[in-house]
């Protein structure tokens, strides 16, 4: 199958918020764009403008003022396959400019996803795009590859879903994988709400993108939340200005750390779940007592929602409080963690030992979509 050395596999990490795509062996994705499909809210009146019935990614983002934006992936699960096909089509033909029928394709997914989801992914790759071979890998496992470890617990938090995956000597421990449907998009929504309470109105799908930008540029995680609140009350040291697209300037203060605090206190937005620190701890406690020490010493952060300044220190502090007192805790936050899932995929797909792992088109034709459960962990 992969005899021709010139055939570079494609690596496509379909996130809830961003698609990261590129070629195996590269050190960073070539294409990174929002997982958005936009459709016009109004009818076109200018003839010859070349208006389309749908826009994908950055183009949808730039025309967001006149479009209704939809995300085909929610909480890591694809809920609109027609839009998802549009995104993949855009990825291959417009962004990477490749013919998908000429390259093996490595896709990623969140753990504990419905089986039907990966079957449908497999079906579309082989039937719509005629891929010669494909594979579906678990996101967190790829992040561990990227960090150069074979043992550790990965906390992967993106836009739609967070999960903790303990891995020992390269084996994921499925019984200890925990999934938390609390991630970046919920934080954006929380910030929209906080800002609305302050009298700034953000309601449309386009305005949500502005709030996401505010979150990414200005939010941080407090080491001590209560103390930070006190500081914010008495001094203006935490205040920052942000200029909206129309030139209006808004000032944001305690919102900067109140928004991402939700990761540690989901009850702030009415969720009953444990925070990311407890989830990580619970995941470790579900593992064999003999390997916990290795997991505590290798807590690897990955995904865009782990990009908040202060997250590693706070994580370290919270886990230290939960763990046995003599335990050595180490939280690893690689600088490239925003793309570490993709980077891990790039490493995996270019390993010579991986080449027999691909699901070939012939195997798919023989067994159908369910082959994905036999061939991919």
Curated annotation (Swiss-Prot):
GO BP annotation list: developmental growth; root hair elongation
N-acetylalanine PTM positions: 2
Catalysed reaction equations from the record: ATP + H2O = ADP + phosphate + H(+)
Family as reported in the entry's similarity comment: Belongs to the actin family.
Role of this protein: Actins are highly conserved proteins that are involved in various types of cell motility and are ubiquitously expressed in all eukaryotic cells. Essential component of cell cytoskeleton; plays an important role in cytoplasmic streaming, cell shape determination, cell division, organelle movement and extension growth. This is considered as one of the reproductive actins.
Any single Gene Ontology cellular-component annotation: cytoskeleton
SMART domains tied to this protein: ACTIN
InterPro entries xref list: Actin, Actin/actin-like_CS, Actin_CS, ATPase_NBD
A GO term for molecular function: structural constituent of cytoskeleton
This protein's name: Actin-1
Pfam families assigned to the protein according to its UniProt record, in alphabetical order: Actin (PF00022)
Catalytic activity, EC: 3.6.4.-
PROSITE patterns the UniProt entry points to: ACTINS_1, ACTINS_2, ACTINS_ACT_LIKE
Tissue distribution: Preferentially expressed in mature pollen, pollen tubes, young embryo sac, and organ primordia. Little or no reproductive-gene expression is detected in vegetative organs, such as root, stems, leaves, sepals and petals.
Subunit note: Polymerization of globular actin (G-actin) leads to a structural filament (F-actin) in the form of a two-stranded helix. The binding of profilin to monomeric G-actin cause the sequestration of actin into profilactin complexes, and prevents the polymerization.
Record carries keyword Chaperone: no
Keywords (A to Z) from UniProt: Acetylation, ATP-binding, Cytoplasm, Cytoskeleton, Hydrolase, Nucleotide-binding
